[in-house]
Structures are given as structure tokens and as C-alpha cells.
Amino acid sequence: MDEVIKLKCASALEECGKHIQRINTALKLLDPVFPLTEDRLNALSDEQTAVLDQFLYRFAKLQDCIGLRLIPSVYVLLENDTVVRPFIDILNRLEKLDVLTSANDWQYFRSLRNNVAHEYPER
């Protein structure tokens, strides 16, 4: 079973790497508009809006991959525990193992991802 979990971790890390690469590319292209204010957001060109869309999409996909694939796989690999547990319990345990710096930070970024995914500025 360890080999299967290791493969799942490797696959998730590879996917995360692709999302991070696209996020970094988008950030470079968006650098001139940061810090992003309401006025700057309203003045974005169609091309800049497309890049911002790509950034938001990749941020959401990265969060999904980490939360749905990587974190559970790392937990199973480290704890050899396949019992289904509440996600917050897994986060807290990984924080205690120093895999995560903060379970609260993870929840904050997950909440941010959910807000971005469900509240998009009208244009």
C-alpha cells in the first residue's frame, strides 16, 4: 500500500507544480496592476482580465489538488491510517507533525478560494 500512496503523492505534487507554474506566469503578467484596487480592477483590459481569470482558476485548482489529493495522501503515508477522519483533524495532525505550518492558515486560504470561486466581479 505504501507504493500506491507514494504514487498518489507524486502525482498530486506533479499536478500542483503545473498549477504553480501557471500561477507564477499569470502573476508576472499581472505585476503592473498590483496592488489590485477596485479602480485598477475596473480598468483591466480584456487580456488582463483573461490572465486574472487564469490566475483565479489555477489558484482554485491548486487548492483543490492540495486539499483533495495531496494532504490526505501525505496523512495516510505518514500515519499509516486509512480510517476516514474529518479534514480538520487531518490538518491538525499534519500541523503537529510540522508538515503544515498552520491548520488555520490552510482554512483561511480555502475560504479565500471559495469566496473567489463564488463571487466574481461583474464586468
Show which residues each predicted segment covers.
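Solvent-exposed interaction patches of small proteins and small membrane subunits
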Residues: M1-R123
